Amino acid sequence: MSLLTLAIDVGGSSIKSIILRDDGTAASERSQIPTAHPATPDIIVSQLLDLINTQGDYDRIAIGFPSVVENGVTRGAINLHPDWDGFTLAEVLQNKLGKPIRIANDADVQGCGAIAGQGVELVVTLGTGFGSSLFLDGKLLPNLELGQHIFRDRDTYEDCLGQAALDRIGVEVWNIQLAEVIASLYKLFNFDKIYLGGGNSRLVNVDLSSNLSNKIAIVSNDLGLIGGLALWRSSGS
């Protein structure tokens, strides 16, 4: 029997949702609401419950969340609020909704929807922050979270390519820095493919060497929802 999955993508600027069939087709309209600020756990949980209650029938929930996630517990969501560190999000929502829930890092979820499952594949999400996920022959290496690592001098990847950087330096310089980051990541991971997603991927216009230009793909931000199905497929459920 086909199960319906309510897929939710929590971001620093918006929260998106859709109900999906097992084959990835939509069983509902896509919904989107602005992320409240301050984005404390109580406020975001309230937003999630309000959003979920507007959806139709579903059997289970998959959530992409902008932090490291360990067994349903969030670890350091710096683009939301410090109180998310150690918050038992899966348990809280499951107790309130009575539905099975799986939660993973949002870039990991988007990657699950983007990859081909061949070789070394790196996924980068460009939005409020800088998300990342890494796959080897289709197998996820979870919670990579490159965004908070130093790229150059004292600046992290997120310092160079997050929304605040884009607002400060403009799209032209932002693209120059993105090209430098991609070249650096290639030296680090020797990836076969890099997928660029997130809300700001629409602004990507980079000039790269010929050996890198054919390794880049721009992917739909909706893969942050569609990839949620993989959280259930991974267990054969």
How would you describe each model-predicted region?
Residues 29, 34-53, 57-61, 67-120, ...:
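Glycine-rich phosphate-binding loop and adjoining helix at the ATP-binding site
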Residues 89-107, 140-177:
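Glycine-rich phosphate-binding loop plus the immediately following alpha-helix
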Residues 2-43, 136-167:
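Short glycine-rich, Thr/Ser-proximal phosphate-binding strand/loop in the N-terminal lobe
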Residues 174-188:
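A short, acidic, amphipathic alpha-helical segment used as a generic capping/interface helix at domain edges
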Residues 15-19, 67, 112, 130-136, ...:
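Short beta-strand scaffold segments in enzyme catalytic cores
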Residues 14, 185-220:
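Glycine-rich phosphate-binding loops at beta-strand->alpha-helix junctions
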Residues 3-9, 60-62, 121-125, 195:
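Short glycine-aspartate micro-motif
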Residues 61-67, 126-128, 193-201:
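Glycine-rich beta-strand-to-loop/alpha-helix junction loops that act as flexible
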